[in-house]
Swiss-Prot record:
Compositional bias annotation for Acidic residues: 154-166
Example GO BP: ribosome biogenesis
GO molecular function, one term: GTPase activator activity
Database matches in Pfam families: YihI (PF04220)
Name of the molecule in the record: Der GTPase-activating protein YihI
HAMAP family to which the protein is assigned, alphabetical: GAP_YihI
Length: 176
């Protein structure tokens, strides 16, 4: 009752048995494989030619060799080199602070509110932090430098006061 069906057994129609190859056919296939195997790999001289051979096969235009430089003639004489190359002026870096004359800088330092406040604290006997003390010292040193440049000194002011007192004494004494 049960009959074997061909569709259940195989996935398609029944195949005929494959016939065995003869020794000549096997030898011919082996020779073909050997010939194909010989031609595998890179072509001779491919290291030297390199990218140009692969570039042509891909259809791109030929690439320029990066090792070859400019064709522009280079002058070998000293005088020629100076004439052809214009001298470039490098711009000087601008300082953050505008350049002030020594008198203007001295006036600015004397009117500095932070310096005045720190000097008042020092006169009152307070001790300043190391940063504040270093800043005050640097400002006072700069004031001294500027006064020396301008030819001013603290002694000049004291001398002027003494001279004024002497002049007043002369006027009071008798007028010569």
């Amino acid at each position: 009752m049960k009959q074997p069906s061909s569709s259940v057994r195989g996935k398609g129609p029944a195949k005929a048995k494959a016939r065995r190859k003869t020794r000549e056919e096997l030898n011919q296939e082996a020779r073909d494989r050997k010939r194909d195997k010989k031609h595998r790999g890179h072509a001779p001289g491919s290291r030297a030619t390199g990218a140009s051979a692969s570039g042509k096969s891909s259809g791109q235009s030929t690439q320029k060799d990066p090792r070859i430089g400019s064709k522009k003639p280079i002058p070998l004489g000293v005088s020629d080199a100076q004439e052809t190359r214009p001298q470039k002026h490098q711009p000087q870096p601008k300082s953050e602070k505008p350049m002030l004359s020594p008198q203007e800088e001295l006036d600015m330092l004397e009117n500095d509110e932070r310096l005045d406040a720190l000097l008042e604290r020092l006169e009152e006997g307070e001790t300043l932090s190391a940063d504040d003390q270093a800043w005050v010292d640097s400002r006072l040193d700069r004031i001294d430098e500027l006064m020396q440049q301008l030819g001013l000194s603290y002694d000049d002011e004291e001398d002027e006061e003494e001279e004024q007192q002497e002049d007043m004494m002369r006027l009071l004494k008798g007028g010569n």
